[in-house]
Amino acid sequence: MKKYLLEIGCEELPPKAVDTAISYFKERLEGLFENFFEYRTEENISVFGTPRRIGFILSNLREKEPSEEKTILGPPAKVGIDEKGNFTKAALAFASKNNIPVEQLKIIENEKGRYIGATLIKEGKDIRTFIQEVIPDLITKIPFPKLMRWNETGFRFSRPVRWIVSLLDNEVVSFSIAGIDADRYTHLHRFMTTPTGRGERKKIPDVDSYFQIMKLGFIIPKYEERKEAVKTQLTGFANSINAEPVIDEDLLDEVTNLTEFPVGILGDFSPEYLILPKEVIITVCKVHQRYFNFEKDGKLIPKFLAFSNTAVKDREKVKSGYEKVLKARLEDALFFYEEDLKHNLEDFYPQLEGIQFHHKLGSMLDKVKRNGEIAVLLSRELNFENLKDLLRANKLSKCDLLTEMVKEFDELQGIMGMHYALKQGEKEEVAKAIYEHYLPKTSDDQLPETDIGTLLSLSDKLDTVISFISIGEKPKATADPFGIRRNSIGIVRILVEKGIDLDLKKLLQDISREARKVKILRLADIEKEWEIIFDERTIPEILDFIEGRFIAYMKDKGFDTDIINSVVSVDSYNLYRNYLKIKSIQELKKNPEFTDIMTVFKRVGRIIPEEFEEHFNPDTLVQDEEKELYRKYTEVNKIFSKDVEDRRYTEALNELLKMKPFIDKFFDNVMVMTEDKKLRENRLSLMKLINNMFRKIADFTKITT
């Protein structure tokens, strides 16, 4: 079996470009070479990527892909052969059309009859030919975020390509890209193998020697190994100063893809800068310098770890350079901080009028006002009484957007608002809510902890979703420029994970009515006039969108799709209750009799005609079985309804299970679809009563068993 190596040598690739190439190769290679792998194993594909090289090694490759046998059928035998046994014009035309030699024609029998046909053998391609055909196209289609041209060939790539290694075992498989011929020569580390910064040009004799040559050339090609080297050094330096590293996964990924041979250098900064909020120092180090911080007992210490792409001779000189650059950045941050503290946060509130939220949705001040109206309605629904602090937090929630610190570091919005509010004497819960109203920022981010923060977060996200859907700006499959999908996921997570019992439909109806009072959306091109865009007609679209995010969230949690659909099909408005219902049915599925239970429940639902209107009269019941079923229904429904009201869905389902023997007995002994119309409709009405009870939890007909 053979191995194949591809290495594309480039000028310095951006970290995201390295990520893109690695992901792309991992997605494409297995399918592309599936006919050449001798067997499936994780060892077949080894992808690597650094700032100066991307590529892969394929193992367990066949010399040649398997031949394919294909049978082609032509006209029926009675049409393709004449009385003398010769092929007719129809058979000859079939052979000519498919480039089949006449001598290969034969009669082929199948279940449909006898036909003229042929069995063709398609020879498998040689691995070398296949590589020459597909690899140039594979390289060309790497979906880099940005592309550039650099020579007369017009080839586009993330950065200029400088060399290509293409080896099948010890043999060069030639092709050309961007005017460069594939060969067996690579370049080693730029600074640690030559003084010129070009890197030693090195011959790769065969695929098996590649990683050893890289190691000797001070290169760690594999992303995972390089990342582990960064983490090991980070932990080691932390231990040496008796501290804990502040590990940021995004920074870890970025530093990994900025280096081929990461070397950590421990530095210091003046303790005077510790007057700055912790998040400011961490952000300055991360965004501007790609430095890691350390802390003791949850507090930052004045040290950092930078990573060089080379082992340096004069470590103190390099360390001093890192420290000087960081000092300048921290000095700027301290200036911003002190300037911001000269103003009360509330002073910035009127200036929010000057920040456009969206040209159809008014200013950031308009949004804050809308958020406040929604927060009031939410507090009413959830019996939250501290309106004074809620509205105070809402008023201050976006004010830090006007501060110098947030203008410089937009990722600190909310965080700086919290710190400035605390400095200026605001209540702790009010200050914390300014930060928390942005949470969660991602699908796995932390949730707001305070009640005010939770209400403001929901209000802010609801306004964003409502507003953009109302003006027709729903996200596309691959683009969500206004964060509607992200905000919807945030709404789902807050309601479900914090156990908030909220009827979204009722809330949206309340907001719609309130919109007519506060003029929730402004018409952009008429300065003094307003247009009511959000009304009840938009509510189903908004609910459908949020429901879609809820369904995806439930699937990610491991719940069965059919169970999820059975619940949301009868009520998609209260996400927390729906979660509890789904969880309870999923638990019930562990019952060995689940299939039998569902069969009975589904039979009740399926026997009722569509659009059937229930007109039940207990006096019309005739047989003992239907009378017993009705008595059991009235008994169960009383307890069941109370359990549902109190969100005790497991107990409610257990009540429903008590119906099963009575339903079985009813179907075994009572003819529902009798010719007597009065009896038939009364029995169907009884079924509908029972099914309506079932549907307070789910539409069991949608559950597959």
Swiss-Prot record:
The Gene Ontology biological process terms listed for this entry are: arginyl-tRNA aminoacylation; glycyl-tRNA aminoacylation
Q: Which PROSITE patterns match?
A: AA_TRNA_LIGASE_II_GLYAB
Entry annotated with the keyword Protein biosynthesis: yes
Q: What is its EC number?
A: 6.1.1.14
User: Membrane-spanning regions, if any?
Assistant: none
The family note in this entry says: Belongs to the class-II aminoacyl-tRNA synthetase family.
Write down the HAMAP family for this protein, in alphabetical order: Gly_tRNA_synth_beta
Protein name (Swiss-Prot/TrEMBL): Glycine--tRNA ligase beta subunit
- What species does this protein belong to? Persephonella marina (strain DSM 14350 / EX-H1)
- The gene behind this protein is glyS
